[in-house]
Amino acid sequence: MAAAMVLFFSLSLLLLPLLLLFAYFSYTKRIPQKENDSKAPLPPGQTGWPLIGETLNYLSCVKSGVSENFVKYRKEKYSPKVFRTSLLGEPMAILCGPEGNKFLYSTEKKLVQVWFPSSVEKMFPRSHGESNADNFSKVRGKMMFLLKVDGMKKYVGLMDRVMKQFLETDWNRQQQINVHNTVKKYTVTMSCRVFMSIDDEEQVTRLGSSIQNIEAGLLAVPINIPGTAMNRAIKTVKLLTREVEAVIKQRKVDLLENKQASQPQDLLSHLLLTANQDGQFLSESDIASHLIGLMQGGYTTLNGTITFVLNYLAEFPDVYNQVLKEQVEIANSKHPKELLNWEDLRKMKYSWNVAQEVLRIIPPGVGTFREAITDFTYAGYLIPKGWKMHLIPHDTHKNPTYFPSPEKFDPTRFEGNGPAPYTFTPFGGGPRMCPGIEYARLVILIFMHNVVTNFRWEKLIPNEKILTDPIPRFAHGLPIHLHPHN
């Protein structure tokens, strides 16, 4: 046995240089040199190590909560408009500032298209072998039909009822709660009810416990071997897919038997009953993937945002008092036990300013990715076809040029006309604006209304450490002590 181990490691040491050389030459072939017939050079920058590129440095900045530093250093060294790097095994251009954001958001399907890291492709394989980007383009319109303003209006009352029930079972009987844990339960419950009309508590708990395991695999090294974050995430997605496919099969039966006639059409029924642009219907596995993706996206986005909203309201009593005043006025305008409606949410202007300021300081994700579908030039530099581009929200969100004293929590930034165009991009922009933005707004505001009109609270760990992996979260989940108004 010992001899075999020695032989194994000896061979590994001999082969390692060859593997590194192979990786290097394979990678450099993917980075086109300046075209002979093109006068534009490639963007300035560096590609770092073979395959790894500058990914480790980038992830280090992300996990430290200072992803803007990754951009700032390279803007100063290479170009304030665009620079070259290598992330996630891909040659990548970073287009900087609001000008870069506007360019990428306005050239969707003309020069660029959405791109997902290989980790996402491995976790969510499509039934016909097409990429997630192509599949999502086909189904986006179907999802937007229900997730845009007109589609979400009818869910306000239902969502308020779910929140009030949640408050009764999880808040009113407690003196202390862990915000992160209770918000997780709330967001998963809400997505299950709105997207799939699931109200079975045990099933909601199973889905919620699985969804949180996906997050770690999104930016993981795409190596699927036992023990890796990617392997755990893939196993989780398979389990979730089986669970959601069972819900889909039952819904098909219910639709055939007309059992859903009295129910408002949720996203699941809409995806089952509506054909794509090409006249084809989605497979059960593809519908499951899209529903899981939406649930995971909502889980990641909303958990952090709502948790940090409660954190800042505890830290800034004057902000809390203004939110309370706004929400009490809305509550007093309604009959006892009357549920919120769309017009009530439109009145929550200051509350939404608070949520937006949280989204500015703590964006709900690391940013979005695009892929060049043709050669094009930007700021005098060639972006070759196949290159990837990365939009990093902190590049503008924490830039004092666009947000003076960017580390200061100040909801008044969003009063009046608000920030300059393309400087505030937590949900993307242009035709690729996140389809769930209205859903997210409803979930956040309904939560704020119900909690603020019932409680004040104080943090039990005043200077609790914030971890980022890759989404910011409190090390201990933000435990708070509740003080009911009555």
From Swiss-Prot:
Pfam families named among the record's database cross-references: p450
Cofactor(s) listed: heme
Protein name: Dammarenediol 12-hydroxylase
Induction, per UniProt: Up-regulated by methyl jasmonate (MeJA). Induced by A.niger mycelium-derived elicitor, thus improving ginsenosides production in adventitious roots culture. Slightly induced by Tween 80. Influenced in roots by soil water potential, and in leaves by temperature, rain and relative humidity.
Subcellular location: Membrane
Entry GO MF terms: dammarenediol 12-hydroxylase activity; heme binding; iron ion binding
Tissue: Accumulates ubiquitously in all organs of plants. Mostly expressed in leaves and flowers, and, to a lower extent, in roots and stems.
PANTHER family referenced in this protein's UniProt entry, alphabetically: BETA-AMYRIN 28-OXIDASE, CYTOCHROME P450 26
Keywords, alphabetical: Heme, Iron, Isoprene biosynthesis, Membrane, Metal-binding, Monooxygenase, Oxidoreductase, Transmembrane, Transmembrane helix
Biotechnology: Transgenic tobacco plants coexpressing PgDDS and PgPPDS1/CYP716A47 accumulate dammarene sapogenin (protopanaxadiol, PPD).
Functional summary from the UniProt entry: Component of the dammarane-type triterpene saponins (e.g. ginsenosides or panaxosides) biosynthetic pathway.
PROSITE patterns, A to Z: CYTOCHROME_P450 (PS00086)
Provenance organism: Panax ginseng (Korean ginseng)
The family this protein is said to belong to: Belongs to the cytochrome P450 family.
Reactions the enzyme catalyzes: dammarenediol-II + reduced [NADPH--hemoprotein reductase] + O2 = (20S)-protopanaxadiol + oxidized [NADPH--hemoprotein reductase] + H2O + H(+); (20S)-20-O-(beta-D-glucosyl)-3-hydroxydammarene + reduced [NADPH--hemoprotein reductase] + O2 = (20S)-ginsenoside C-K + oxidized [NADPH--hemoprotein reductase] + H2O + H(+)
